[in-house]
Structure formats: structure tokens, C-alpha cells
Amino acid sequence: MYWNKINALWASVRKTVFLVLIVFACTSSATAVNGAERRGRVRWVVDGDTIVLTDGERVRYADINTPEVAHDGESGEPYGDEARAFNQKLVQGRWLNLELAEESRDHYGRLLAYVFLEDGTFVNGELVQQGYAHLIRHQSKVVYWEKLLNLQRQALKEKKGIWSLPVSKPEKYYLGNKRTWVFHRPDCQFGLKTAEHNRVVFKSRYEALYQGFSPGRRCKP
């Protein structure tokens, strides 16, 4: 009688442990696959570089920036709608693997991530390769930054997407900031305030972009 109770108790314990392990395995598969730090399914595509997952998490693609779409009464930028449409085609409703940038969130609280489809397609890179995004440096992981920079250089050479647009008010030179990886027009107050040891001069807008610097938001070089 005593041993029957012991055996029944152990059977119950084993069953409970088994169920716990099953739940743990399922939970783990929803957050980490193939080395990704998170996993999620896309509910909504906001624009070319931002998505919302089914759990409500907002994700900003690390190291890239796409043109703005019309919002809050503001007009959209050239290729903004095309970038969003391309992003939708890539990710809408799909499961994604996310690898977080060194700085995991931006000042809006969005996750900063390198995003991959289940077949390994690098979403950030696809947008850059097609000329729908330019580089903007976060706390970048070197391996992805170098890949994205090479893709941008190729898109620049081929004048794809945003790189097919004429340069607005070209300058004789541009001022870059080696600390922020941003470049400005020569008369821009933000460029002029750059410390001498951080300042770099580019002969053209193309040269600044080729080196991975992003255009300043105020003077829009």
C-alpha cells in the first residue's frame, strides 16, 4: 500500500515536470530561434523601417532610415510610400527573428533590431540594397554595419531608389561629425559646432554617404 502511494506520487511528479518542460520549450521557441534574441510576428507595418508585432512591441530597424510617409498632417517624403510598400511585401504577417543592436531601444522606446525572415533574409539589408533606406548609425554591431555599408555603396553606384533623386542645393563641401556619424551643410549651426577633433570635410554629398555618414535632419544636406 505504502509503495503504491510512493509510485503514484512519483508518476505525478514526472508528469508535472514533463508538462513544465513542454511549456518552457514552446515559450523559448517563441522568443529565440537560430540565435536570435527575440522572435515575433508582424501585425502592422508603420513605414519603411518600423513595424508593430502581435504582442504590441514596436520595432525600429537598426542602422537604417527610410523616407517619411505622410502623417499628422505632414507631407510624406519621396519614396516614403514605396519604402513602406516594399517593407509590407517583405514582412507583413510573417514571423521574424530579431537580433538587438548594442543599444537595444531608441528614445521613443522602440526596440532597435537587425531583422531576419525565417529563411534568413536580412530585412534591413534588403531595404538598403533596393535604395529605400540610407544608413544611420546606432550602437551598431560591426558585422551588420559593414554589410549594410557595402549594400549602400552598391545602391549609390546604381542610383537605385532614393539615390536616383537629384541633389537638392548641392554644396562645395560638407561637414561631418565623426562622433555622431552625421554630416551637414557648411553653414549649418550643428556642423559648425562640431569639435575640431570630430570634424571631417567631405568634397561631395556622395562621398559622405559612401563613408556611411547620414544627412542631418535640420539642414537636410
Enumerate the language-model features and the residues they cover.
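Small beta-barrel nucleic-acid-binding modules, primarily SNase/OB-fold domains
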Residues: 2-221
